[in-house]
Swiss-Prot record:
InterPro entries: LytB/IspH. Catalyzes the conversion of 1-hydroxy-2-methyl-2-(E)-butenyl 4-diphosphate (HMBPP) into a mixture of isopentenyl diphosphate (IPP) and dimethylallyl diphosphate (DMAPP). Acts in the terminal step of the DOXP/MEP pathway for isoprenoid precursor biosynthesis. The gene is ispH. This is 4-hydroxy-3-methylbut-2-enyl diphosphate reductase. Belongs to the IspH family. GO terms for biological process: dimethylallyl diphosphate biosynthetic process; isopentenyl diphosphate biosynthetic process, methylerythritol 4-phosphate pathway; terpenoid biosynthetic process.
Length: 376
């Protein structure tokens, strides 16, 4: 039996929900579906929120996984194929998600003849540009974040591109088969940063969704391993604002509810921030996930990750006020698209490009000259 609803005050964090980059990506995908002929795909999940993904799929926007990537890249008409079949395979649009992709993936899609809609977050684009620039100058690049996150995997590709540029600056160019001594490391915490090899010069960039505290700790550890370290400010202000708003909300409530996708990096960081307050804290993706125990508190604060749509926030707030779950807000988990790992997407595309030059696929975890690697 559900406990009596004792919630008297529900307070939203001052800043919560969709950030500008996610809102832009969703609108671009919906615009593509409304105005482009043929199939519309997103390359991997557009955002890490199951409700948003289900809504996009209901509108005819499919999530492309690695098993179907070859179809997107190479879709020649079969001999004797009917005209409508040719049109169905060639009139296709691929939307690059907010997290971005490696440049070789983008180039492979363009060569395939697909119409590419680039919905990469502008802040992520800036990180890509800076990472490529540092590598082109011959600096090693250290990325602070989740090594399997799409944003990090994409930025690694820009480090490869920058290292290739560094090659062109060598007198007479690089010898055949030789690549510049530019290495890229992905570190997920200060402990991994402290295990970096000793480096002369390197640049440190953050995944846009990590907390400032995490980044500061990683930077401090990296300074003990790098003689000359450039620390770039690449954390998204929207992420920092949501975390600050949650901290400001905490003293005024008895419990916290964070709304967002379980696989969303920014939502997980928000959840971590909430738990640091020592208040009872729960993560919910939709109304059905609201825990009965929360109704025992009289004052509840709510926040939401940057990929959480407004409609879900409103539905959860309504359910907290009424003690019930509105049927209209429910989305079946069976309707969610299959989510594939970002590295698999990147690997599938790079293998289609070929192994020559900077576009060669690199095994995750390997660290070698001009290799994208991870400190374990």
């Amino acid at each position: 039996m559900r406990k009596v609803n004792c919630i008297k005050v529900i307070t939203r964090a001052h800043t919560l929900g969709y950030c500008g980059g996610v809102r832009m990506a969703v609108r671009m995908a919906e615009h593509a579906r409304a105005h482009h002929r043929g199939s519309v795909y997103t390359l991997g999940p557009l955002v890490h929120n199951p409700v948003t993904l289900a809504r996009l799929r209901a509108r005819g926007i499919e999530c492309l996984d690695p098993a179907h990537l070859s179809f997107a890249l190479h879709a020649p008409a079969a001999p004797g194929a009917a005209p409508h079949a040719v049109e169905e395979k060639t009139a296709r649009t691929v939307v690059i998600r907010a997290h971005g992709v490696a440049p070789e993936v983008y180039e492979a899609l363009e060569r395939s003849g697909a119409q590419v809609v680039d919905a990469t977050c502008p802040r992520v684009k800036e990180s890509q540009r800076r990472a490529q620039g540092f590598a082109a100058q011959g600096l090693h690049v250290i990325l602070a974040g989740d090594r399997n996150h799409g944003e990090i995997v994409g930025i690694e590709g820009y480090v490869r591109a920058g290292a290739a540029q560094a090659c062109s600056h060598l007198p007479g160019g690089a010898p055949d088969g030789m690549l510049p001594q530019v290495q890229c490391f992905v570190v997920q915490n200060a402990r991994e940063a402290a295990a970096l090899p000793c480096l002369a010069r390197a640049a440190l960039l953050a995944q846009t969704t990590i907390t400032q505290g995490e980044y500061d700790a990683i930077a401090a550890a990296a300074r003990t391993r790098v003689r000359e370290l450039t620390v770039a400010r690449t954390i998204c202000a929207a992420t920092a604002r949501r975390q600050a708003a949650l901290r400001a909300l905490a003293p005024t409530v008895e419990a916290l509810l964070v709304i967002g996708g379980a696989h969303s990096a920014n939502t997980q960081r928000l959840l971590h921030t909430a738990r640091e307050t020592s208040l009872p804290t729960w993560l919910v993706e939709r109304v059905e996930d609201i825990p009965p125990d929360i109704y025992a508190f009289s004052a509840v604060g709510i926040s939401a990750g940057a990929s959480t749509p407004d409609c879900v926030i409103a539905a959860v707030e309504q359910a907290l006020r009424t003690g019930g779950a509105p049927v209209a807000s429910r989305v079946s988990s069976s309707a969610l698209p299959k989510v594939s790992t970002c590295r698999a997407v990147c690997a599938a595309a790079t293998s289609s490009v070929g192994s020559a030059g900077a576009s060669g696929a690199v095994s995750p975890g390997a660290v070698r000259p001009f290799a994208v690697g991870s400190v374990r």
